[in-house]
Amino acid sequence: MSAMALSSTMALSLPQSSMSLSHCRHNRITILIPSSSLRRRGGSSIRCSTISTSNSAAAANYQNKNIGTNGVDGGGGGGGVLDCVIVGGGISGLCIAQALSTKYSNLSTNFIVTEAKDRVGGNITTMEADGYLWEEGPNSFQPSDAVLTMAVDSGLKEELVLGDPNSPRFVLWNGKLRPVPSKLTDLPFFDLMSFPGKIRAGLGALGLRPSPPAHEESVEQFVRRNLGDEVFERLIEPFCSGVYAGDPSKLSMKAAFGRVWVLEQKGGSIIGGTLKTIQERKDNPKPPRDPRLPKPKGQTVGSFRKGLSMLPTAISERLGNKVKVSWTLSGIAKSSNGEYNLTYETPDGLVSVRTKSVVMTVPSYVASSLLRPLSDVAAESLSKFHYPPVAAVSLSYPKEAIRSECLIDGELKGFGQLHSRSQGVETLGTIYSSSLFPGRAPPGRTLILNYIGGDTNPGILDKTKDELAEAVDRDLRRILINPNAKAPRVLGVRVWPQAIPQFLIGHFDLLDAAKAALTDGGHKGLFLGGNYVSGVALGRCIEGAYESAAEVVDFLSQYSDK
């Protein structure tokens, strides 16, 4: 198996939607949301922990002070009903709405998106100050067709920026940053693994390894069995730290890296499954690619000229008054006629909304609390997903602070670096932001985004932001930065107490149990979405959004007026 397949991105993807709960106000108002757009008024902008100028203040400007009250309906009948309410205005919720508005535009689905915060985008947090542009949540995405379609449909085609696919990626091993092979011809020559380790990996990928066990394997068990100890310790373990901030001895191979896991199931070995997949694609070619989409040149990652926040901002602007911010869901009930009644705390008091279907894209622990009145079994399953803390630490150094041995043609080049937990550093990984995308730092400066914490280091919650910045700086001076360099400029330290859902062994069992409990309890039309369902990468959230939209459309097809 190529290391390229498991090391294709250095981006660490954080949860894409979140929702805070707060106490309800007084003054109950029951309304019918009309399908026509209403005017919206401005809100307030998000601020950063250290330097607090946001490039996306527009994303915060969605307060709904004046709610239309045409068709006020105080009971269960006689008034109109929404087709769908999407709970959570992070990237998953917004992209479900966008999919309903574009891919299924012919159906004229009447929906709203509700978000408890005063801005959309969830944990996507782009900041800008003094010539710097940095991310404090997700950093980038892989430019899959689903992501590119969402960007183009949002009017952002000309704002896309893609990293150089030839830029190297590095892993720290034995005190040295070592490049990860980016193409098959690199495999014999890279020094991250020994010659015997490469032979072991090749033989295992061909099928000369122990047979798979009957039980669900962890990532560590699967990789050690199939590809050997070196691939696990020097490639996959740091990759798990960088993508999931997780412990590979607990992560489920099937759930966390299903596309690799299924190869062995399909073809008897990783290579066998790969060959079978290639043949299946030849026998069943995809439909013609959308000619509107740009074509990336090789494996790379992408963003937008002014950061990831451009996407949720653009989607929200296009959806207009269908997006309701500062709407905190306080209760959900099922009526006798099959509709759902949702109660919200809003700036205008309590609002009740009636709908045929609901998609919950909030984190599982929030969904658990909200759904407990409907199903204890579903709520209990959803409460068991684990979210460890992660901090995003953005530092800037003068270019001359970079160690000479880490420069390529006199510049810091590459996507970034990942760190195995065995190498004695706290930092999980480092993104070379100013090398990856243009316009991220002033001339003569570098911008470096670092992640620290995760499932193996929850103690970051006991540290101050200054202590976290010092810990990252200390690690970098052992690897990338000259020990005697001046102190960095700390642009931002953002701590996410519950960051990335862990796809642990038994993940699908919990998810299936929650879904089954809702269905068996008579709660059809109530769907679960978000990153704990689709996958943690931003691209998987968008792909999952299209899947959720298809579920909603299929459910609504039972109504004669659809």
Swiss-Prot record:
GO terms for molecular function: oxygen-dependent protoporphyrinogen oxidase activity. Residues 1-48 form a transit peptide. Pathway: Porphyrin-containing compound metabolism; protoporphyrin-IX biosynthesis; protoporphyrin-IX from protoporphyrinogen-IX: step 1/1; Porphyrin-containing compound metabolism; chlorophyll biosynthesis. Its EC number is 1.3.3.4. Its main location: plastid. Binds 1 FAD per subunit. InterPro entries: Amino_oxidase, FAD/NAD-bd_sf, Protoporphyrinogen_oxidase, Zeta_carotene_desat/Oxidored. Residues 278-293 have a biased composition (Basic and acidic residues). It is a peripheral membrane protein. GO terms for cellular component: chloroplast inner membrane; chloroplast thylakoid membrane; plastid thylakoid membrane. FAD binds at residues 88-93, 115-116, 137-140, 323, 536-538. It holds the Pfam family Amino_oxidase. Residues 274-302 are annotated as: Disordered. It catalyses: protoporphyrinogen IX + 3 O2 = protoporphyrin IX + 3 H2O2. GO terms for biological process: chlorophyll biosynthetic process; protoporphyrinogen IX biosynthetic process. This is Protoporphyrinogen oxidase 1, chloroplastic. It comes from Spinacia oleracea.
